[in-house]
Amino acid sequence: MSNLKQLRTRIKSVKSTQKITKAMQLVSASKMAKIKSQIANSNFYIEAVSKMMSAILSIDMYELSIEEQKFFNTVPNKANLLIVMTSQRGLCGTFNYSIIQQVKNDIKELENKGEQIKLIIIGKKGYEALKRQYVNYIDSYFELPKIHDENLMLQVKQKIMSAVENLEVSNCVIYFNKFKNAMTQIMTRQQILPVAKYQDDSMIDNPIVNLVGFGYKERGAKPINNRSATSDIVGESKSIDYNYEYEGENLISNLINLYVNSQINYALLQSRASEEGARMTAMENATNNANDLISKLVLKLNRSRQAIITTELIEIIAGSEAV
């Protein structure tokens, strides 16, 4: 009987765990859907800013100031700034493992070359995995808030901008998981700075038309009066709605800020969507495994009960025959 009690207790415990994993699966699915919507809404803006920045390198109409040149040129003999985006919580499968392993491999390669390294880590899991071995490389650590927070993006951007402006780093690379679907996340290593030259000939051939779509004609020019324009930056016609805040003289500086902001925002959104997708898949697998385990335990319980009943019947029959 004690064996039956243990089986019932275990079944009850597994069912309780199954309810938790199922709830976590549904919560992650809801969060993932919301973040996917945010990604869809921001994709065009992020791509447009990136291509505008890259196109500046291909045209001669803009004379970059000394401060602006720091964001477009590699500074020799300075540190490599690695930004690592991981999760704040666990229970998300191999989401963090692929990022951490890639970072460790790259750090080892940079160490072999004798290069300097700086780390900015976002997310508790990445910090815990890297702090013991690379504590001397860690420049900053940020905890990941429960919801997408612009303050985090601004803090990370400020760290990057400060490091570049003070000539502390030669380049900036960001590591994050790119969302493909709930079951697939792609480990991505993307260079933010220096800004890479854009290779699309259509953009280079007619840069003024594309930049006019964003409200400027050339350095020093005033913003155009109309509030919407058609841009061909991403290869298709789309209406862009915008507000004017800056004179053309500050165009490059403000574009640099927009560019760094957009890259960090893109990586954060992709990482969050990937995390929730990985957690949803992990919890779905856990729920299914719990269901299989419950079925096996119930079968074992029924067999044990049947064995006890059979034994008792045999004893009763044997006793009656003896009488």
UniProtKB/Swiss-Prot annotation:
GO terms for biological process: proton motive force-driven plasma membrane ATP synthesis. Its main location: membrane. Disulfide bonds: none annotated. GO terms for cellular component: plasma membrane; proton-transporting ATP synthase complex. It is found in: Cell inner membrane. It is a peripheral membrane protein. One of its GO terms (molecular function) is proton-transporting ATP synthase activity, rotational mechanism. It comes from the Bacteria. Pfam families: ATP-synt. Keywords: ATP synthesis, Cell inner membrane, Cell membrane, CF(1), Hydrogen ion transport, Ion transport, Membrane, Transport. InterPro entries: ATP_synth_F1_ATPase_gsu (IPR035968), ATP_synth_F1_gsu (IPR000131), RPE2 (IPR022436). HAMAP family: ATP_synth_gamma_bact. F-type ATPases have 2 components, CF(1) - the catalytic core - and CF(0) - the membrane proton channel. CF(1) has five subunits: alpha(3), beta(3), gamma(1), delta(1), epsilon(1). CF(0) has three main subunits: a, b and c. Produces ATP from ADP in the presence of a proton gradient across the membrane. The gamma chain is believed to be important in regulating ATPase activity and the flow of protons through the CF(0) complex. Belongs to the ATPase gamma chain family. This is ATP synthase gamma chain. It comes from Rickettsia rickettsii (strain Sheila Smith).
